[in-house]
Regions:
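Short functional linear segments
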Residues: 1-46, 53-66, 71, 107-116
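ATP-dependent carboxylate-amine ligase catalytic core
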Residues: 29, 34-36, 63-157
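Short Gly/Thr/Asp-enriched flexible loops that form oxyanion-binding sites at enzyme active sites
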Residues: 57, 150-160, 410-412
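Aromatic/hydrophobic pocket-lining residues that form π-stacking "cages" and hydrophobic walls in ligand
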Residues: 57, 128, 209
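Acidic, Mg2+-coordinating active-site environments of NTP-dependent enzymes
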Residues: 109-113, 137-140, 144, 159-247, ...
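Nucleotide phosphate-binding/pyrophosphate-handling subdomain across enzymes
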Residues: 135, 140-143, 152-156, 160-163, ...
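C-terminal helical cap/extension that packs against the catalytic core
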Residues: 202-217, 340-396
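A glycine-rich beta-strand to alpha-helix segment
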Residues: 384-414
Length: 420
């Protein structure tokens, strides 16, 4: 089997859709020797901010000299990004080796049990657990939940800590229709007295979190109550009890990144007793270099991409544009997948600049004829970039929406730059 054949096999499981539940995962992992039981790992859940928080933690612990695994989704350029070691994506050789071990087990699942076929995400999660727990053991892993928490495929290990940067309305068909219902699903990963670090401004979400923490014997750490972050992404001060980190500068702009980084700092301090090389000075140095591709990322001096893929993340993007780029004329290009609340997202975006919509090559991308007619349209992002993006720094060009869309934009723009 070649690497491409392995990749095609993984993606071929996409047809089995999304199936919440852990029975298939538990069976496959048992057949592989339960590698997840060997893991020392932190679980990151939430609606937005998971990837940035994972990236901050990865940068801190890698810079401290530990062997660090990360599991994130979706990928921005290359599928192998989803399983990374010390900030570098898994090699083709290692992924091929994992698939050769896992594929026979996956194929036995529907034949030897009453379970249906495994989904694509379940298989990728099994590959990750096998890699970090058995094939290439790590000192610590930072694992991002795929969707929700309680019934998510990742929820089969005992976490050192659980982090939740935000709760918003997304994937309601699966997770619930209210913030409280979604919060209950997310915090469902909390177990075994692991500390729970979170940020929220909603009483209903806080109540759900605190109730679950009491049930699990977990201590909670809430941003703004137990630890604070005062300032902006250019410079903020972090305080927890008598511990203070002053003048922290982030590589990523935006007030939401201050919150994400603060959760990562809090977790790092709590884990310090088992990972003593993580010092306050190292944390500050690491955060100054922790970039996350596809999130408020500048591909050119005046061209930003940002994967604002739901109402909450669109609001965060708008706050950033209004606070950091108020002196610019803003032009926006947007594309999404058809499970997102595009009317609300578009209504927000049109308030900050000249808005155009497009479609992209993805199975459930929103087609042009499905957008409200009031918005300008272009057939594809390449056309928009060629027609709109100039070297005039009076304007800021922002491409946003689905992370799948952003990944295609990023790849193409960087390829054009390399051809010059």
């Amino acid at each position: 089997m070649t690497y491409q054949e392995a990749l095609d096999w993984i993606h071929g499981q996409l047809k089995f859709g999304i199936k919440p539940g852990l029975e298939r995962m538990a069976w496959m992992l048992k057949e592989l020797g339960n590698p997840q039981n060997n893991l020392k790992a932190v679980h990151i859940v939430g609606t937005n901010g998971k990837g940035s928080t994972v990236n901050a933690l990865q940068t801190i612990f890698t810079q401290a000299g530990y062997e660090v695994g990360t599991f994130t989704s979706p990928y921005i350029i290359d599928f192998k990004e989803r399983i990374s070691l010390n900030g570098q994506m898994i090699s083709e050789e290692d992924l091929l080796d994992l698939v050769s071990r896992v594929k026979p087990v996956v194929e036995r699942l529907p034949k030897e049990t009453e379970h249906e076929n495994a989904t694509e995400f379940e298989i990728i999660t099994v590959l990750m657990f096998l890699y970090f727990g058995q094939v290439h053991p790590v000192d610590i892993a930072f694992i991002e939940a795929g969707m929700g928490g309680l019934h998510d495929s990742t929820n089969l290990f005992k976490p050192l800590a659980v982090l939740c940067p935000s709760i918003g309305l997304d994937h309601q068909a699966i997770l619930g229709n209210t913030h409280a219902e979604i919060a209950a699903e997310k915090v469902g990963v909390l177990k075994n007295g692991a500390p729970f670090i979170y940020a929220t401004d909603r009483t209903d979400v806080r109540d759900v979190f605190e109730k679950k923490a009491r049930e699990e014997g977990s201590k909670t750490y809430e941003l703004g109550r137990d630890f604070t972050a005062e300032g902006s992404s250019h410079s903020f001060d972090f305080t927890y009890g008598d511990q203070k980190l002053d003048d922290i500068a982030l590589a990523m702009a935006g007030q939401h990144q201050v919150a994400n980084a603060s959760l990562a700092i809090m977790a790092s301090l709590l884990l310090q007793k088992d990972y003593p090389k993580v010092t306050p000075k190292l944390i500050k140095d690491a955060l100054a270099h922790a970039n996350w591709r596809g999130r408020t990322e500048f591909l050119r001096p005046n061209l930003m991409i940002d994967g604002a893929h739901n109402n909450e993340s669109v609001k965060v993007l708008i706050d950033l544009l209004q606070s950091e780029h108020a002196d610019k004329e803003i032009e926006l290009l947007f594309a999404a997948i058809d499970t997102k609340p595009i009317d609300g997202m578009l209504a927000q975006l049109k308030s900050v600049g000249d808005l155009t919509v497009t479609s992209f090559d993805y199975p459930n991308s929103v087609k042009l004829d499905k957008y409200p007619e009031v918005y300008k349209q272009v057939p594809d992002f390449k056309t928009w970039i060629k027609e709109h993006v100039t070297t005039d720094n009076k304007n800021l060009y922002v491409i946003t929406g689905s992370l799948y869309f952003i990944s295609q934009v990023r790849k193409w723009v960087l390829e054009q730059a390399s051809d010059v």
